């Protein structure tokens, strides 16, 4: 089956349209709904809209758009109707309803939700921090972090760091590997901001075997053997015991659920 092409078009960064598109895609079997997102942010002219229309015509793409300026929105609407293209106006119907409800015209300013206020800068800083200090790259990040995640391989440290960063938490993650001594600074920071991520031996074994298959390798590699996994788990327990930090079992939890548990713990202990 050919990939479904979706054009995300916006007169701002396009984050809202992309989130809605991805939310819709997530409701379908990925094997049956293979997709490709094409991004067209900062649309400012009719020529920009024409480019989107041409690509949609050439690729039979669905256009998902958030255009705030009335003239841009109207032009897009006319063009998709003219060429009978598949499209979804994310913001238009909602803004029309709100305008009618409050009997007031909207600002019609693209990107107003992303005004560069303190909260926005804090979020960007947190995202950059998570990238810079991913996988224990630099121990200098330890005292600067709001949260330090510890765990062996395949315990979702990186996606959790990114998820929490989007909640404006500066997160550093540190891999726990028997052959690598944890950074000295790990024992100097407040253990209340450390979270250890635990996973069951059975779940980890399945994940690692699947990972090896994806890499085209046999599932008998030492990386996925029970002996190696048990060695890593034992070492993990030893390090966590020395630090004295809380442990969250991620074996049966989604990223969002684990992140919420972490946030709850961190916020509870801020004032203690």
Swiss-Prot record:
Q: Among its keywords, does the record have Nucleotide-binding?
A: yes
- Give its E.C. classification number: 2.7.11.32, 2.7.4.27
Task: List, in alphabetical order, the Gene Ontology terms for molecular function in this entry.
Answer: ADP binding; ATP binding; phosphotransferase activity, phosphate group as acceptor; protein serine/threonine kinase activity
Q: Where does ADP bind?
A: 151-158
Keywords from UniProt, A to Z, are: Kinase, Nucleotide-binding, Serine/threonine-protein kinase, Transferase
Q: Which reaction equations make up its catalytic activity?
A: N(tele)-phospho-L-histidyl/L-threonyl-[pyruvate, phosphate dikinase] + ADP = N(tele)-phospho-L-histidyl/O-phospho-L-threonyl-[pyruvate, phosphate dikinase] + AMP + H(+); N(tele)-phospho-L-histidyl/O-phospho-L-threonyl-[pyruvate, phosphate dikinase] + phosphate + H(+) = N(tele)-phospho-L-histidyl/L-threonyl-[pyruvate, phosphate dikinase] + diphosphate
Pfam families found in the cross-reference section: Kinase-PPPase
Recorded superkingdom:
Bacteria
User: Which PANTHER family does the annotation name?
Assistant: PYRUVATE, PHOSPHATE DIKINASE REGULATORY PROTEIN 1, CHLOROPLASTIC (PTHR31756:SF3)
Hey, which family's this protein in?
Belongs to the pyruvate, phosphate/water dikinase regulatory protein family. PDRP subfamily.
What NCBIfam families is this protein classified in?
PRK05339.1
Q: Explain the purpose of this protein.
A: Bifunctional serine/threonine kinase and phosphorylase involved in the regulation of the pyruvate, phosphate dikinase (PPDK) by catalyzing its phosphorylation/dephosphorylation.
Name of the protein described by the UniProt record: Putative pyruvate, phosphate dikinase regulatory protein
Species of provenance = Staphylococcus aureus (strain JH9)
């Amino acid at each position: 089956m050919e990939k479904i092409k979706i054009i995300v078009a916006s007169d701002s960064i396009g984050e809202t349209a992309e989130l809605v598109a991805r939310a819709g895609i997530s409701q379908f079997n990925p094997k049956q709904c293979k997709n490709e997102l094409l991004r067209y942010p900062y649309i400012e002219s009719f020529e920009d809209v024409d480019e989107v229309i041409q690509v949609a015509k050439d690729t039979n793409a669905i256009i998902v758009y958030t255009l705030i300026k009335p003239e841009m929105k109207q032009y897009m609407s006319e063009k998709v109707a003219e060429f009978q293209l598949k499209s979804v106006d994310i913001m238009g119907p909602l803004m029309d309803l709100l305008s009618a409800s409050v009997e007031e015209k909207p600002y019609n300013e693209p990107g107003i939700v992303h005004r560069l206020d303190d909260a926005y800068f804090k979020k960007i800083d947190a995202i950059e921090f998570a990238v810079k200090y991913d996988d224990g790259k630099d121990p200098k990040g330890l005292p600067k972090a709001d949260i330090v995640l510890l765990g062996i391989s395949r315990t979702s440290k990186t996606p959790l760091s990114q998820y929490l960063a989007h909640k404006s938490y500066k997160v550093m993650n540190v891999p726990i590997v028997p052959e690598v001594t944890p950074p000295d600074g790990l024992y100097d920071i407040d253990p209340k901001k450390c979270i250890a991520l635990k996973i069951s031996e059975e779940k980890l074994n399945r994940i690692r075997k699947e990972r090896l298959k994806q890499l085209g390798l046999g599932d008998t590699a030492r990386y996925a053997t029970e002996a190696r996994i048990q060695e890593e788990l034992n070492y993990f327990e030893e390090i966590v015991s020395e630090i004295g930090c809380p442990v969250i079992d991620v074996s049966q939890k989604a990223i969002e659920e684990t992140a919420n548990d972490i946030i709850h713990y961190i916020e509870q202990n801020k004032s203690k």
